[in-house]
């Protein structure tokens, strides 16, 4: 019986890529810089103290993969751990350092075209675009129209939004159009309808995602985003390994978290909603228990990126990594003889880096299974090696990009 479990630690980069200079990210290193801060006692909070401890991920080869990527061991990680899995680091072939590009490339389809972007920091959106969106939605105006941090924009504009009923439109360095609205005063269904209108009106702009950012709270300093985020993505430009498994092998692809949104539901046969790392873990364990032959269980742990990476919260990121490390054995204990587990990421988001954007980094490729030989996979030239490996494992037609590493 063939089953694969893919766990994406969203934004967990392990060192800058050779092309990082093109993105302003030379020297970025999500794992390494978190470990440095922990070692120096600068990442303590009520959940964790001291050096970064990831014993289980180190056994799976994380410390070695980081060493091969950067030339140094991350402090605190066990450099002498007995390795029980295959490990490597992968560079990105795609033109961007965004979530869809990273995930699509993982599934064998790199993004070789350029996304559209809203590059102006203020007055970011063309008036003709916003006029059409507002007219279709029956709304008399909007707030924002700028590049913004998702949490800061709520403090800046949340109260005005509640008073006026006008949605908050904002963007970032990624190919995104984000809409923040209060779940209670504006309404979640109304927000999702507005996002669908925006998705349709953005067809000619080549924007990767429209993101619904619902929030709650009575006022400034008390607003918080809810778990009802939705990502409305465009479809991948060609069939991913997920689609090939579903169509060629009548297999099952179980999306946990925001995976289905990222792939615009293409190739997804079952969707499981969960919010927060503990709930995502529980959902993953439950779906593994239920999984039959020719099944991929695919989970995105978005909080590493959204709650800690973008917010530049080193201590929070470290605590989340240690929590994840403490539970990964639960997945491994459910694995059968032919199963494979792949731990990876979609880009970096170094919480010590200037700004709030993603960073262009290698991603870890950690592979475990009873039949997977332990040892180095070296540097992989594309994330698509993961997709090609899955295509070979499940016996689908090959992908156009990537090399099988098993």
UniProtKB/Swiss-Prot annotation:
Q: In which pathway does it act?
A: Carbohydrate degradation; 2-deoxy-D-ribose 1-phosphate degradation; D-glyceraldehyde 3-phosphate and acetaldehyde from 2-deoxy-alpha-D-ribose 1-phosphate: step 1/2
Please indicate which superkingdom the organism of origin belongs to: Bacteria
Q: Which cofactor does it need?
A: Mn(2+)
Q: Which reaction does it catalyse?
A: 2-deoxy-alpha-D-ribose 1-phosphate = 2-deoxy-D-ribose 5-phosphate; alpha-D-ribose 1-phosphate = D-ribose 5-phosphate
Return the broad EC class. isomerase
| Cited InterPro entries | Alkaline_phosphatase_core_sf (IPR017850), DeoB (IPR010045), Metalloenzyme (IPR006124), Phosphopentomutase_DeoB_cap_sf (IPR024052)
Q: Which biological processes are named by the entry's GO terms?
A: 2-deoxyribose 1-phosphate catabolic process; 5-phosphoribose 1-diphosphate biosynthetic process; metabolic compound salvage; nucleotide metabolic process
Record's protein name:
Phosphopentomutase
Molecular function terms from GO: magnesium ion binding; manganese ion binding; phosphopentomutase activity
The record lists the lineage as:
Bacteria, Pseudomonadati, Pseudomonadota, Gammaproteobacteria, Vibrionales
E.C. numbers? 5.4.2.7
* Subcellular location as annotated: Cytoplasm
UniProt: Mn(2+) 2 binding residues: 305, 310, 358
Q: Which family does it belong to?
A: Belongs to the phosphopentomutase family.
State the protein's purpose.
Isomerase that catalyzes the conversion of deoxy-ribose 1-phosphate (dRib-1-P) and ribose 1-phosphate (Rib-1-P) to deoxy-ribose 5-phosphate (dRib-5-P) and ribose 5-phosphate (Rib-5-P), respectively.
Please tell me where Mn(2+) 1 binds in this chain.
10, 346-347
The UniProt keyword set, sorted, is: Cytoplasm, Isomerase, Manganese, Metal-binding
Q: Which Gene3D superfamilies match?
A: Alkaline Phosphatase, subunit A, Phosphopentomutase
Q: How is the cofactor bound?
A: Binds 2 manganese ions.
- Recorded GO CC terms: cytosol
Q: Mind telling me which Pfam families this protein's record contains? A: Metalloenzyme (PF01676)
